[in-house]
Amino acid sequence: MHAPSEIRLTFNQDRPQSNEDDGSGLAVQEAKPILQAPPMYKVVLFNDDYTPMDFVVEVLETFFSLNRELATKIMLTVHTEGRAVCGLFTRDIAETKAMQVNQYARESQHPLLCEIEKDG
C-alpha cells in the first residue's frame, strides 16, 4: 500500500513558503479606497443680439443630442434670461462640448458663446 501523502494548502502567496505553519492560514487583503464621483460641470450658453434662434436650436440638437422641443425651450431661456444650462458633464466632456460649440459658431460667423461652470 501507499503511504498517506501530506497536502499543504497555501492561502497567502505573497509570503515565502516555509515548512513551519504559523497557524493563521488566512490571507490579509488591503482595504480598497472609497471611490468618489467626479466633479460635474455645467455647459452654459449665453445670449447675444446677433445669433439667430434657429442656429441656437441647431447647436443644441447637434452637440447636446436634444430633441427639437427641449432645444427650443433652452433657446428661449437663453433669449429671455441671458443664459441657460445645456447639460451637466464631467470636466473633460464639458470642456470638449464648449470648445466644439464655440468653434462651430465662429466657423458659422456667429458670436454665440458657450462656457463651463463647476456645478454646486
Swiss-Prot record:
BP GO terms, sorted: protein catabolic process; proteolysis
Coiled coil location: none
Gene3D superfamilies per the UniProt record, alphabetical: 3.30.1390.10
Name of a matching Pfam family: ClpS
InterPro entries, per the entry: ClpS, ClpS_core, Ribosomal_bL12_C/ClpS-like
Record-linked SUPFAM superfamilies: ClpS-like
Signal peptide: none
Region listing for Disordered, in residue ranges: 1-27
Annotated disulfide bonds: none
HAMAP family on file: ClpS
Purpose: Involved in the modulation of the specificity of the ClpAP-mediated ATP-dependent protein degradation.
Quaternary assembly: Binds to the N-terminal domain of the chaperone ClpA.
Family: Belongs to the ClpS family.
NCBIfam families per UniProt: PRK00033.1-2 (NF000669), PRK00033.1-5 (NF000672)
Protein name: ATP-dependent Clp protease adapter protein ClpS
Organism: Pseudomonas putida (strain ATCC 47054 / DSM 6125 / CFBP 8728 / NCIMB 11950 / KT2440)
